[in-house]
Structures are given as structure tokens and as C-alpha cells.
């Protein structure tokens, strides 16, 4: 442990604390996050997070340090401290000397040092994974939509014609109609004939064979395997199960990387004209949204990229953030740190690893509700409500372009990753229900806390199979789905997990979920009511903030915002059973408690079994993908 001497205002700095020479004002500085404890009425001890150092200082100095959380020049910090610290008796020069001393101690970090340390921590000489060379397959999730699959395969055939990569493709077919499954298989075979690519079809029969193969070596995981990968017997044809194909794709690519596509997507990727190079470090920045009159106009709203779209994404996954920001295309401009709180940039660690890439959408929104349209950034919001005619079209989000202008990194995303680094253990997701992508992201942040997702300033085409009235779901304000509840519960209620090994972390998380499943019926009911009250209150607060921030908004937008607030308010005050959106509408309190117990127990069982399943799949390697 390294202990440093006391810092005070209005006194000479001790000889043992060498002061850094005057720093040019263009540099920006922010204070590190840490823990403090009082020693006396005048002194305290401060320990930065992640170090064993302790620093003794006066309470006035600690207050000054607390006022330097955002990246600003030392002159700006000095002026702010003088204006906002009551009882401070120090000259500007004295304040500046203390700030210089804090810089020397490493308690104030410059923007340039922050970025430089990121590159060093990323290990510029270390060997990162090469997502492109370790690609196991481009996995396509398909169901009863042959027309959508035909469009996607046509765009992939054009990609292969241009780039001649003959990449491997796997079609994971969840179709319930025999005719649709047969048509999907025919389309895949025709794609293979026209491109020369290796293809693998994984339909119901092949999925059962995978379960049987893994169950032979891991018999204790048979029940979990069936739930993770197979459609439940007697389930409705329309029961959504995107997580089943997701889990199968993760097993098929264990030890390598994969690309995950849905059958209603299509190439090429498009980059907006105002896209910028580099990474935006602001954690509060949000993607922008543009609105168009038709699907065709939205699909062609930006120029197609000239690069290999898969190489673009695969070239990033598996790298540390430090290695990534050393590349000009992903550099972080230190000047863009101005005004950002250093404590909110903890995810920007040089040794953090990119486990997946995310991109925007042109065409239809990939959400089932339009609630997000009432949380747009000011520029997008102006386009959203431009006039009543376009507004009535825009609320359905059927012809939009959504995405970023500049790359961005984050720990959790609500959208399906495009490329995934699966060279090290990643978690499964819930095999049933919507929101499986968001839940996977939360689980990955627990399993691999050093991981990040990279959002790229490109968009992929999305053409839904039929028109959706998202506005009806928006204004009715339905309850959240189970996967969103589970993700929120894990982030807010599960205690910090200290284990380093990803498999151990999943086991610990499973214990927390079994704790929910084992709670009394009354406690589970109370848990659901508390969560629904929180979700409703948060939605109301955010909408109120939007409403109050736009006093001159069109009356039709204001009316809809009030309507959504009122719908959430009615749901907040009602005494109805605490139902989540995936559960039967006629269920009573007891049935809701029972479903919560069953669903959390099943997810716990899946997390317990998953590490062994993933490792066995990794050992099988190419033989796993070749299952027929």
C-alpha cells in the first residue's frame, strides 16, 4: 500500500509530493472515482478505485476533488471550486497549486493520458482474436417466412458474386409449417448451387439430433438441452422462440466467431453521408432516426458500403478496446471528452474485449412497440412530428433509418449483435419470448464483465413480412415481457459477483435466480408488483420529461404523450394480477407467481448446464456444424 501525505489549501506542499510543472490549459482533467473515509473533523482518507494507494487530505480538498468529476481545464476547475466551496479561504494561485498536486498524484487525469492509457492497457503487442479467420458460420434464423428468406439469400448471393468469399452458411429453421420448411430448404440448396458456398440446414430433425448427441455425453443436461434448443411440445405455432436458434448458433460456433442474421434482413449495409470515423466516448449519446415516405425510400436512404460487410464487423470482434482505438477508423479524439464525467467512463478500459458488433436499421423498425419514438433526440423528434400526415405514418416505424453517425461502445444493447466473438464462453439466452437479445446482452455482461459491444455507423435492411400497428401497442402501454423483467432484475437486484471464471459467474447467477424461484408465493407476487410499479413509474417520468422539454410541440404529439402517460398511470394504480406480457391475460395472482417461479427456475437450470454444453460443442468443432 502506498500512502501519501496530506493535501491542504493555503499551505506549502510537502517536499515528498513533487509538483508537476504548470500544465497548458488546453489539456482537460477529471477526478478519478474512489472511496473516502473520515479521519477527523478536518481530514479524511481517499482511495482510488482499482489501486491500493491511499491519500490523506483535508475535507476541503476532497470537496474540490469531487467538483472536478468532468473533464475541463484546470482554470475552469479552479474557478468552479472557488465559486462553489463554502468557507474556502484560498487564493486562485493556492487552488491551482493543489490541483497541480492532485495531477501529480494521479487523482486528476488528463484527457490525453486517459486515451493513451487505454491504448497501452489494450496491449498493442498482444495477439487478439481474429474474428474473420475464425468464422465458423453465418447463421440465419428462419421461420415460416420463405419470401423473406428468399430476399435475404438473394442479397447474400450478390455479396458472394462481388467478394467471392464462399463463406459457410447455416440455416436454423424454426418453421412449424412443413411447406415453409421444404421451401426454405429448396432456397438454401439453390443458393449453394449458385454460389458454391458450403451450407448446412438445421431443421426440426437436425435440432433433435443435436440434442441427442449432446445428451449422450452430458445426460444430466438432457432436460435443459431440450428447453434450450427445441420447440416445446404443444406450443402455439406463433410462439416466438428466437432464443432457441440463438442458443444453437452459439453452440455451433463455440470456440470461434459467428454472424447472426434473421430471415427478414437483407444486404447491403449502408453508411449515412454524415457518418464520421472514430468512437464517440459519450455514454449518453443516442442513435439518430430519419423518417421516409416508403420502404424503398428508407432502404435506399444511404449509400451502400464498398467494403466487405462481414469483414468490417468480424475485423473488430475479439479485439481489445485498446487495440481498436489505436486504429484511425476507431480512434477516440481526446477533445471529445470535454464535459464527460470520468466515473461514467469505467467501461472504456483498454483491456475490455469487443465480443459483438451492433448496427442500425434501414426499412422497418426491429421493435414491436413504438414507445421509443417518444424518447428521440431533439433533431430526430423534429422530423418525427414534422406534420400530422407524416406523423401518422411515422408512429408505425415502417420506413425509417435508425443508427449512429459515429461508432460507439457499450456494455449492454437491446438489439441482436451482427458478429459475435464466441472464442470464449458466452451465456445462453432464454429460448422463448421476445427480448432474448436484450437478455443475452445482460447475461454476457455478467458472464464476461470485461466485454463490450461495438455499435458501427452502418445500417442493414429490415423488411417485415407484413404491416404492424405498433402505435396500438404503444398507446396501450402493455406490461414488460419476462426477458426484460429478468434483465432488469439481474442488473438491479443480483449482488456483485466476484468470481473471475465465466462458468463460475453463471453458476452464481443461477443461484440468485433459484432464490427467486424458491420464494414464497406472496413474496413472488410482491416482487412482480414492485417491478411493474417501477417500470410504469420510470416510463411516466421519462415521458413527463419529454413533454415538459417540448412546450411548443404539435398538439397531436402532445395528445399521444398524454395518452401513453395516462395508460401507464391506470396500470400503475390498478389492482390487477401482476402479469408480464408473455403470460396469459386471464391469469390470477397465483398463476403469475407460479409462472415467475417456473420461468426463473428454467433459466437457472439453463445457466447451470450451459458451460458444459458449450465446452462439449467447442470440442466437437466442425463436426458439430456438420450434423445432418
How would you label these PLM feature ranges?
Residues 267-348:
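Conserved donor-nucleotide/metal-binding helix-loop-beta segment in metal-dependent transferases, i.e.
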Residues 2-9, 42, 50-132:
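Long, charge-rich, low-complexity alpha-helical segments
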